[in-house]
Amino acid sequence: MINIPTSILCRLGARSAISRSFGTSVVTKSEAKTPIQKFGWEYLKKQRDMKRPIAPHLTIYQPQLTWMLSGFHRISGCVMAGTLLVGGLGFAVLPLDFTTFVEYIRGWNLPCAVTAVFKYIIAFPIIFHTLNGIRFLGFDLAKGVDNIGQVYKSGWLVFGVSAVIALAIVINSCQNKSKAVKTA
């Protein structure tokens, strides 16, 4: 009689059982499709043959303030979150802090007009995202959504107030910079 340890037999038995179950449960790609999946696949192939995009494309929609503000709200939120993530990780890993970074930029001695443009590019999305977020909170409370005219008025108001506040911030920072130069 051959003396084989039971642990080996158990392992071999488990392996053969596993391989048998995998061998019988494999389904080919064509068999795995349900009728609705087949319909969807045929529909997509037909659309591709007609040279249509898979999903609706921005070029087929008429530009409207509502979806443009909503899109800019999402984009500005993602850009700000990404900036905070990359900046936070950068300042955590690199051997410099925010003050050193600002002093490095100031060392370039850029004219006020150039820094004003960059400050506006930074300030406008932050203010817009904040004000439009408040507007959307009002929409969540069902305030002003029943009248499309109100929706457009609030959208233009948010856009205009954001532009004015961002401009005021930039003008204030340039005035503070010129005062600091005069006192130095």
Swiss-Prot record:
Keyword S-adenosyl-L-methionine among record annotations: no
Cofactors: heme
Pfam families hit by this protein: Sdh_cyt (PF01127)
InterPro entries registered for this protein in UniProt: SQR/QFR_C/D, Succ_DH_cyt_bsu_CS, Succ_DH_cytb556, SuccDH_FuR_B_TM-su
Binding locations of heme: 129
Compartments (UniProt record): Mitochondrion inner membrane
RNA-binding among keywords: no
Annotated TM spans: 65-94, 115-139, 148-169
GO MF annotation: an example: metal ion binding
UniProt keywords, alphabetically: Electron transport, Heme, Iron, Membrane, Metal-binding, Mitochondrion, Mitochondrion inner membrane, Transit peptide, Transmembrane, Transmembrane helix, Transport, Tricarboxylic acid cycle
Superkingdom: Eukaryota
One GO BP: response to oxidative stress
Main function: Membrane-anchoring subunit of succinate dehydrogenase (SDH) that is involved in complex II of the mitochondrial electron transport chain and is responsible for transferring electrons from succinate to ubiquinone (coenzyme Q). Mediates resistance to enteropathogenic E.coli infection.
Family: Belongs to the cytochrome b560 family.
Assembly with partners or alone: Component of complex II composed of four subunits: a flavoprotein (FP), iron-sulfur protein (IP), and a cytochrome b560 composed of two transmembrane proteins.
Protein name: Succinate dehydrogenase cytochrome b560 subunit, mitochondrial
Species in which this protein is naturally found: Caenorhabditis briggsae
Lineage: Eukaryota, Metazoa, Ecdysozoa, Nematoda, Chromadorea
Gene name tied to this protein: mev-1
